[in-house]
């Protein structure tokens, strides 16, 4: 992957994503849906989904596939791939080599955002697409992305089956006779900027924040991103997928699922060696909040910290519940004590809360 000569940041990343000063990362689009992205720990995400499935008694994978299907359609609605839908469905007009070329567009994106290396196995126009991904992770996310892209190209409903064998993911997409019956709650959130803004130090050549270029390494051959501090694998994950998952679970189970998400993320964040250590309280929180912002998780509109307590207002968190849980985990790591949260406001697009040491 070609890198910026000044900061080492991948040039493809600079062309695909915009690191905004409000703590969000946007996928650059020419029209169509605006997509918000976050740089997340792949194992932590998988742990979140696995823990949710175990606690609620059923797998959330099918919800992730459906949510990501819509994200996949939105992403590729303005890429070269959709023009294939104007080409008649036949072996003469849609030979396999042409489809492989189109899938290469998706494959380069998949590789760039850390999900592995894509290979097309077979294709029949209007009927099926079989492919596999080496060094894959978060299988439902990948399956949903390719399902959405395939439906966009073919212009008909499709269905997907997938299986993991080690780190190789096999995906089989076939035409479906069923209409799209996706729930309206699986819509994509609109992205709005917060009031606060960070003045990042940016590379003069590519415009990327200098600190993010120093935080992570890219392995273009294996299609992976590595956090230099932890050695963990990171991925660029669509924020709208997470929020669609939460809406669906709230509809099926009720609002209590928020507490399950919160408690699970606190536990996972405490396990991960990502909390910065600093002697001064202000320096600690400045560093920690900046790290979350650089990963596209948002930045508070207001933040106050005291002895064993923090109070936050935020309007652009990647997910309000999960962001609050990360703050709680950081406080617990700093104090060595468990914490309690009091929500003053808890909407999808804005929240206010106080977190303090448990008494």
Mark where each language-model region is.
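Low-complexity, intrinsically disordered Gly/Pro/Thr-rich segments
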Residues: 155-160, 335-344
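Short, non-transmembrane amphipathic alpha-helical segments
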Residues: 141-156, 324-335
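N-terminal accessory segment detector
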Residues: 1-141, 159-313, 318, 344-352, ...
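C-terminal regulatory/effector modules of DNA-binding transcriptional regulators
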Residues: 316-321, 327, 338
């Amino acid at each position: 992957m070609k890198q910026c000569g000044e900061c080492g940041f991948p040039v493809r990343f600079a062309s695909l994503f915009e690191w905004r000063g409000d703590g969000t990362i946007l996928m650059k689009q020419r029209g169509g849906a605006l997509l918000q992205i976050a740089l997340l720990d792949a194992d932590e995400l998988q742990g979140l989904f696995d823990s949710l499935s175990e606690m609620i008694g059923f797998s959330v994978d099918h919800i992730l596939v459906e949510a990501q299907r819509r994200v996949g359609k939105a992403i590729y609605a303005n890429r070269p791939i959709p023009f294939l839908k104007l080409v008649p469905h036949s072996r003469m007009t849609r030979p396999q080599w042409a489809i492989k070329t189109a899938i290469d567009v998706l494959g380069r994106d998949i590789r760039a955002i850390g999900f592995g290396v894509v290979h097309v196995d077979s294709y029949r126009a209007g009927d099926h697409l079989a492919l596999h991904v080496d060094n894959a992770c978060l299988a439902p996310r990948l399956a949903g992305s390719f399902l959405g892209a395939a439906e966009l190209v073919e212009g008909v409903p499709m269905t997907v089956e997938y299986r993991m064998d080690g780190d190789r993911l096999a995906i089989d997409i076939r035409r479906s006779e069923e209409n799209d019956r996706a729930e309206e709650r699986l819509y994509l959130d609109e992205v709005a900027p917060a009031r606060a803004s960070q003045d990042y130090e940016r590379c003069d050549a590519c415009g990327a924040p200098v600190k993010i270029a120093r935080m992570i390494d890219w392995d273009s051959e294996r299609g992976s991103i590595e956090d230099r501090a932890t050695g963990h694998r990171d991925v660029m994950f669509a924020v709208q997928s997470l929020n669609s998952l939460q809406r669906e679970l709230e509809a099926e189970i009720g609002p209590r699922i928020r507490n399950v998400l919160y408690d699970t993320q606190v536990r996972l964040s405490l396990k991960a060696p990502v909390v910065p250590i600093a002697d001064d309280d202000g320096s600690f929180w400045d560093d920690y909040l900046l790290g979350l912002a650089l990963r596209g998780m948002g930045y508070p509109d207001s933040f106050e910290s005291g002895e064993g307590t923090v109070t936050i207002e935020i309007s652009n968190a990647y997910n309000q519940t999960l962001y609050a849980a990360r703050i709680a985990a950081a406080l617990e790591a700093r104090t060595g004590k468990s914490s309690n949260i009091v929500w003053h406001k808890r909407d999808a697009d804005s929240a206010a809360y106080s977190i303090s040491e448990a008494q």
